[in-house]
Each structure stands twice: as C-alpha cells, then as structure tokens.
Amino acid sequence: MNESLVELSAYLKNKLGDKLEETILAFGELTIVSRLDAITGVLMFVRDDSRCQFINLTDISGVDYPSRDKRFDVSYQLLAPRHNLRLRIKVRTDENTPVASACSIYPGAEWYEREAYDMYGILFSGHPDLRRILTDYGFEGHPLRKDFPVTGFVECRYDNEAKRVIYEPVVLRQEMRNFDFLSPWEGAQYVLPCNEKAEGEK
C-alpha cells in the first residue's frame, strides 16, 4: 500500500471527521464517502488544503444500485499533480434529492454533471445549465439505470420519404435469445438456421 495514501487517509479523517461517512483504502486507491450535505465543503478542502492540493477534477460518474434507498453513487475522481496522488470522493443520493453542483469549485464539472444527469437522472442543485448532453431531444428515461430496458423504448431512423429523422416504437425482429452461460457445452435450446441438416442427422 502506498504510504502517502495511508497518511492522507488519516489526515482527511482527522480534518474532515463528521463530514465523512467512511474512508476506504483498497487496491492501492483511497476512496472517501462524504455526507450529501457536506460535499461542497469536502471538495473545497481537498482542493485548497496544502497537504491535499487536488486541483484537477478528471471525472464525475454515476453508479446505480437499485436495491438501495439511496440508489446512486456520485463519484468524483481527483488528481493532485504536486503530490502525484489520486483521490475518489463518493456521495450517495436518491432519484429526487439533488447533489450540490461542483461547478463553482471545479469549472470543468459542468459537462460531467450534465452527463450524470442525462445517463442516470441524478439531479445537481446550483448547476448553471442542467440539461441532456448525450441523448437526443425528447429522449425518455435514463439509459444507464439498471431498470432501463436493454432495447430502449423507441428507435430512430432516417425516413427517406419524409426527409427527416423519425422515432418509432421498438420492434424486435427476433425474440431475445436464451443462452445457458453456466454450461461450457450447452448452447441455445433451439435450432439455428444453419444447423437444420446437422440436427436432422442425429
């Protein structure tokens, strides 16, 4: 384990104390879990404190745990070039409780937060322009949530006659296949189009 991360973990526990829910040192990485109402204070501290100096926000991502009451983790990936250290800060929230925006602390957070909103529906209070960034206008749902259907709700295509993009309900050309992933020898329970002859010889 990197000795610098062990020292940093102890330092953050000492300085941030009640603002943190837990600290995790695993696989050579330090993760701290912040209370939802303390996230801006924690981010400002790790940016401005001379022992930390995590001045670069490299990513904000979401993770969906549908079985939890606070189903979303918002994960901030930070870099301190001066100390050559990385830090992950997590905060937990639900579908209706917004996380305070980090845009005033890290200006680069704006597009990362828009992506988390678009993909997961995570809300950020105080964001200057919280709207979709990757999906199309009028898109329904949030595609990286675990309860979002794999096939989606609609499909879009260019209609040559109408000379525009149109949206239609998803039509599956074939049923979902049933694969037996537990057996290395057993395949699908039906005959594939190219195997009729082989099946007839049995």
UniProtKB/Swiss-Prot annotation:
Keywords: Cell inner membrane, Cell membrane, Membrane, NAD, Quinone, Translocase, Transport, Ubiquinone. It is a peripheral membrane protein. It comes from the Bacteria. Pfam families: Complex1_30kDa. Its EC number is 7.1.1.-. It catalyses: a quinone + NADH + 5 H(+)(in) = a quinol + NAD(+) + 4 H(+)(out). It is an enzyme of class 7 (translocase). It is found in: Cell inner membrane. GO terms for cellular component: plasma membrane. One of its GO terms (molecular function) is quinone binding. PROSITE patterns: COMPLEX1_30K. The keyword Cell membrane applies. SUPFAM superfamilies: Nqo5-like (SSF143243). Belongs to the complex I 30 kDa subunit family. NDH-1 shuttles electrons from NADH, via FMN and iron-sulfur (Fe-S) centers, to quinones in the respiratory chain. The immediate electron acceptor for the enzyme in this species is believed to be ubiquinone. Couples the redox reaction to proton translocation (for every two electrons transferred, four hydrogen ions are translocated across the cytoplasmic membrane), and thus conserves the redox energy in a proton gradient. PANTHER family: NADH DEHYDROGENASE [UBIQUINONE] IRON-SULFUR PROTEIN 3, MITOCHONDRIAL, NADH DEHYDROGENASE UBIQUINONE IRON-SULFUR PROTEIN 3. NDH-1 is composed of 14 different subunits. Subunits NuoB, C, D, E, F, and G constitute the peripheral sector of the complex. This is NADH-quinone oxidoreductase subunit C. It comes from Bartonella quintana (strain Toulouse) (Rochalimaea quintana). The gene is nuoC.
